[in-house]
Amino acid sequence: MKSLKAYAQAAHFGPTMLITAISFLLASRLWWEGPAYVIAFTVFLGQLLIGWSNDVYDYQDDLKHNRVNKPLVSGQLKIEKLRRATFILLPFAVIANLLGPLGLKGGAVYLLGVGCGIAYNFYFKFRITSPLVYFIALAALPASIFYAVDRNPPLWVLATSSLLGVAFHFANVLKDLSADRDSKIGGLPQRVGKRTSLIIIAILLIIVITILLNSPISSTFTSDFI
């Protein structure tokens, strides 16, 4: 049981379950609960890949900063085991998403988002273009579910998802700004600092709210299968 909890912590359980829950709600609205459960599971597998690869890559830096809330640092989980689990999971996650209810097109789009998350872990978090992968990945999630039901995702859905993704990126980094700079992590939030990041978050949220208030939400998220 402790081992299972450690794997869950290494997957960044909160964000992972949030994305999984969103995928279930979207799939339930656009399709029905049967495939929605399967879609949520396949999405969950993709989020595990992102979270686990992040903790594997960050292991040395987490040790340096004594982040004992991380299971690899606290000793609850060995890095060899987490690395092995990540590589074992990879083909299953790819196959499940491509051959599951998302279909080839929807599955490929979602896996693009997963790829963006992994690319952030290994490359983009050091670059000024760090928000780009969040912009793409958070749009890929709803887009994949729309494609699964043979519908094109509305532009306003993609826009709000992307902007929320970027806002989350800036918000998520705030608590670790000093440690990140010490570790030479130079994404855009680390470069502009806390005050500017907060301003950017506020602007993005205002734009998102404005778009939502002027969008046909109820008619968009209606299933054709009922």
Question: What function would you assign to each model-found segment?
Answer:
Residues M1-I226:
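Multi-pass alpha-helical membrane architecture of UbiA-family
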